[in-house]
């Protein structure tokens, strides 16, 4: 198996020169420059979200990714149609292959690490091409016969080009030019945009109750002003159906607070210099969210691809029993989006429930959904540490390279001790991320529980990175000022 793994990575070598690549930073990038590059990346993403695809004839067809758009950072009918789906899917596939030892990757060697990243990028490009062709052939932009060969090819080229841009923007940030990763950044931007829009949107929608504002807060003020019965107006603003309400908004705020609170949970392992064991040591923190938001990102990639395949197959073969097992779809009554929802099969049982009333009405669905989310997040979290350089062996090697050891342990036994904490922290942290996502979904939070989790963890990590950089700069400045003051004193008395 190891030999086949090496052969697989070797097969990537001939393609490495043709893959788009961002050069690594040759010097340390100042924090203000990182903020500038990060802002440019966000601006380019928002621009691409607003530029419609040229050549499409139908924008009102059912959207297989409607329920996942916020999390996939995509926007239907625009250059950002694919969003981060190709990158995340390629990462998911390569992670599973490496984690299950189907391919042999030694993350400790530079060559294997480079080839693995190249293989992931190559797979991402192939998935971009595959999804672009699938979107066009599935009729998402109109019948292929109506589009014509020229328009169909043009749409595929636009989707492919924008997909390559997303891959390059992600690599730009990953190479140290910006803060965080484009994947998390785009999701956070999309989620925050969705929350703001659903809170303050002035768009009016004609429902069975009459014309209403889409924005929850706008609707609250409108109902309080126009209704004579203020108690009923408040009740309608807090609990209206099929549109964002104030309860959804309050649930969103509560989830934000909970995620920020749990971000501070960590276990600190004491470490000391290997050659000076009497010196005051430091601490190596193992956070509750050890793998951050990666488990939920990978779980989302899995579900989104299943949704897409299931809905396309059901549309073409609605009477096939095997397709029914994968998922049955229909448009719900009183729907203002016109989108399909899963009503049976695997797709239904792994879809979130959006209120406690739905839990009571279908407890089997709720139970299976909870089991799926918790198990998949724990599994992805444990697998992720093996390919991301954060496993017990990787951390042990990093500490040895820094001439550090765990207090009370020899260097040879350090990995065994770390194995007691890191895999458990990864699995438990993944389950906690999944549990918070479930709670947010059950409470009906705006932007979905998964989306809010991704947004909060991304914003929190970015804040920590900026704070660390500013603190480091301040400490360096204080050191220079002190040295300068000492030098001046020596000159005065020398």
Swiss-Prot record:
Gene3D superfamilies: SecY subunit domain. The keyword Membrane applies. Belongs to the SecY/SEC61-alpha family. Heterotrimeric complex composed of SEC61-alpha, SEC61-beta and SEC61-gamma. Disulfide bonds: none annotated. The chain crosses the membrane at residues 36-56, 79-99, 122-142, 147-167, 177-197, 249-269, 294-314, 359-379, 426-446, 450-470. This is Protein transport protein Sec61 subunit alpha. Keywords: Endoplasmic reticulum, Membrane, Protein transport, Translocation, Transmembrane, Transmembrane helix, Transport. SUPFAM superfamilies: Preprotein translocase SecY subunit. InterPro entries: SecY/SEC61-alpha (IPR002208), SecY_CS (IPR030659), SecY_dom_sf (IPR023201), Translocon_Sec61/SecY_plug_dom (IPR019561). It is a multi-pass membrane protein. Appears to play a crucial role in the insertion of secretory and membrane polypeptides into the ER. It is required for assembly of membrane and secretory proteins. One of its GO terms (cellular component) is endoplasmic reticulum membrane. It is found in: Endoplasmic reticulum membrane. GO terms for biological process: protein transport. It comes from Pyrenomonas salina.
